[in-house]
Regions:
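Structured soluble/peripheral alpha/beta segments that form catalytic or ligand/cofactor-binding pockets
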Residues: 1-173
Length: 173
């Protein structure tokens, strides 16, 4: 999420190792220049595919709405998303991964939920409320591993008409 006052990145997910399974929420933003992470019991992670929804305790992530709130986080975020921009899908390319999306043994899968949309709402940090009027991008990754090396470049803060270019060099070992 980016607006004129603040930029923020939120990562929600599930991490599984042989010893431990956890759900988590990570929040980074430009007001504190640090990252906060809260871990949860994996049972607190509730996913629904249609309509898309994820909840972790009091935090909710939907196609048109995001609310993040936990007493262990110094930040509360409440945003509505307007007119999400989706990538056109085809049988050849059901996700950004193209035909690789059909391979069931991929270690990591990637999809873009929302390439860009306008967002409005508020972010509360250290008892100060920041009214947000900005843009937001949403993606999801899933699988049993994540690449050791990758490059992701994106910019949505352009004055000109929307243009998107994708470039990916797969690295196989």
């Amino acid at each position: 999420m980016v607006d004129n006052q603040v930029s923020a990145a939120v990562i929600i997910g599930i991490a599984k190792t042989q010893d431990k399974q956890e759900a988590f929420i990570q929040v980074f933003h430009t007001l504190c220049q640090s990252m906060e992470k809260v871990s949860y019991d994996i049972k607190d992670f509730v996913y629904q595919e249609e309509p898309f929804s994820i909840s972790i305790k009091n935090s909710i992530f939907k196609k048109h709405y995001i609310h993040i709130e936990d007493s262990k986080l110094s930040t509360v975020i409440d945003l509505e998303l307007d007119m999400p921009l989706h990538i056109q899908t085809t049988k050849y390319a059901p996700t950004i991964m193209g035909p690789f999306a059909y391979l069931k043994n991929m270690q990591c899968n990637h999809a873009i939920l929302n390439l860009e949309s306008q967002t409005h709402g508020y972010m509360k940090y250290q008892n100060q409320i920041y009214n947000i009027q900005g843009i937001i991008y949403q993606e999801k990754d899933w699988g049993n591993s994540f690449p050791k090396k990758y490059i992701w470049v994106q910019s949505n803060c352009c004055l000109q008409k929307k243009q998107f270019y994708f470039y990916r060099v797969p690295q196989f070992h």
